[in-house]
Amino acid sequence: MAQIAATKIAMVGLPEEAGDKFPSQLSGGMCKRSGLARSLALDPEILFLDEPTAGLDPIAAAAFDRLIGDLKASLGLTVVMATHDLDTLFAICDRVAVLVDKKIRIGTLADHLEDPHPWIRAYFHGPRGRAALDGNSQQHSAIDVGSQSLAGLA
């Protein structure tokens, strides 16, 4: 059991001594990583996350997004996440479910970016959506949105 804990603690980027500490002795970001290590302890195929970057500063949130993306790729995880963080959405998600008009719309980010529904347009193309799109396009290759790229939507 100790070896599994040490492996998962290292996997999420925590120092070895973090395993001997109480949550009150860890920073907010370290607590998030500790919770993630606990979630990975049983080697799940599906990882459920609820607002994983809530309470983190932008630098720590971006690092956590990269960690989730790396774990998703290296472990073959399916990640089901509830988030309102557009940066996280654009950094991690392959498919997105949006609740609008008491219905769930599921699609790729490109699908939602092209959706004509006023609320979806306001959410994904508003100031925060444009900032997330622009930040994502500068960090990664452009996501095709029909005949437009992310840079063309800002």
Predicted features and spans:
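Conserved ABC ATPase "signature" region
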Residues: 2-17
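Conserved ABC ATPase signature
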Residues: 22-26, 30
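A short, proline-enriched helix->beta-strand linker immediately N-terminal to the Walker B motif
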Residues: 41-45
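Catalytic Walker B motif of ABC-type/P-loop ATPase nucleotide-binding domains
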Residues: 47-50
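Helical segment within the ABC ATPase nucleotide-binding domain
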Residues: 62-74
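H-loop/switch region of ABC-family ATPase nucleotide-binding domains
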Residues: 83-84
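A short, surface-exposed alpha-helical micro-motif characterized by mixed small hydrophobic
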Residues: 89-91
